[in-house]
């Protein structure tokens, strides 16, 4: 019965460890192979613009539309180039395939060379240039399924995009989940104004090139610099800018340095190193768990070893037998792991936020990984117990005089220390990541994000906005509304101002285009001056006449300009080519990720640049207010569906990557503690069995269960204390590494360390207490008789 129990615990421990290892391996593979799914991905680069002004620099992932044709015509190292105009940045689109409008967000314009670089599988359509003519569109298979009963027969059909007809020329496979590009609809770029007439301004396009094989990168860089100088250098220097075009390998975008206006949030390669380490640590503590349980079980197998040696078995035969047993357990663990991995695929995908491709485990490399894992676990876990058991002397084994174990006490204690260390360290990591996440979710951003609704604002809706605004406010469903070019959680548009006078320092800063009620809608804290008024709206029409306009600056901008808050109001600056008056100063608010410092910001009136309507709802009854808003919306914009986002939910979504990391840490720290507890159970079992006679005598002499618990647990808690010291060192290092990626970070209290150590200690105490109680309840008379 005991053999079955130990075998069950061994298989369970190894299975959990192997499942964890394989799940993490698939996650790491998914992240590490971002954008490597495309042919010749090692030859593909993406371009970015680097602006330098007054010693300040910005790197923006977007470039002008004229860059791609210039690359194709003037740089021989370029085999083919393409560009993407991500329309979802500015607005959603309405798609109608004959059964009514549906709003879609994953829409982009691309040129005819797109599929020569991003070679998705063509499921339907003619090979060649799919998007060479105006008003052509390619759908992914998922998008085609939404609009056509027979998606592969959609080619040749016409669909309406914002009431304009587009002909479907192809159906392609969906973009892989590990691609930084992800659209459902790809329309021909030549359908747009800049597609017909490429321009060197504005820079609203993502540009890529496939270089010729074995291209000279130094020569390519030199020619790129010459091209930039030819078309942009003189013009931008006249504005005080130095500009250069950088290029970045396609395969390093996701795990590389983040740039402004990234198409998709990037990740951090440090996370992959961390999770890879966690995977190996879980396997190691799974092996330790097996060793400890095998050691405990060996006290039950000494007679078997002695008898077999008396009957002629030699040490190699016994060694082979015990290794074979560990290999069988390892094989069982792998088989159960693959089954569990298949069954829990969806759970892990929800935890990690990535899709798991189990087919990778059936590839030659995947099969090699699984076999190597099985053999490694079998050999490493079985070697030490096999060495000890096969080395027993027959007479001492039969007489229960086990001499080999005492000499290995240091190893077993070291293994326990390591298990405690891993468990506490993972728990500490979980607490640290979670505390930073909580800090980010509860920090005062400097503006209202609760009860603020964002509505996507389409470019052709402007003429009806006044009607929408007045109707909404008449219903009391909203307190105020404001048009903006960005959500306040993520503002990226770049501008510059020149203060003039004695201060000749030009300042690069971020621009927030709004209407006059932005301060009221977001409840911004005005430190000096006054907020915008409806009279400021009239300035928009006068911009071309170089009329004076009003702007509001934040504290960071004021500091950079060397002004005080009070003296800033009324100052004149040159902003965007216009003489502008500083009308007010607002307290700094977080308009970007907390990974970055709050930078200089200018707020200015320009509703024509708006992409969003922000609506501040009254407190309480959000469903009722949204219902009223929808009724008003349908009355003003019946052709567009009512779609809304809560600002606080969008803010939380910004940190989805960190939330995924936190959930993964929670999951695997729990698994580590579970496996370590089973290993501890095995070692306590071993100690309790060795001291059964002593415990029985103490019980006869009147000892209580708590007395026995103190005796058996004292050594383990000394080991826990030693582990805690190592874990504290790890925790200090991890907190510094993890938090270094945030400009604004939480304070890590010493109580976090105490809590992690105490939690693991409690689990250990419960494990030891359970086993001790079981031994204590045995009949001492029977135990002493057996002895």
Where do the protein language model's features map onto the residues?
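Membrane-proximal extracellular/periplasmic loop immediately following the first transmembrane helix
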Residues: 24-91, 101, 202-209, 221-223, ...
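Mid-to-C-terminal secondary-structure elements
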Residues: 111-124, 137-267, 467-657
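Generic structural signal for small/hydrophobic residues in well-ordered secondary structure
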Residues: 10, 31, 47, 71, ...
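Hydrophobic alpha-helical transmembrane segments of multi-pass inner-membrane transport and secretion
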Residues: 2-29, 267-303, 330-331, 411-436, ...
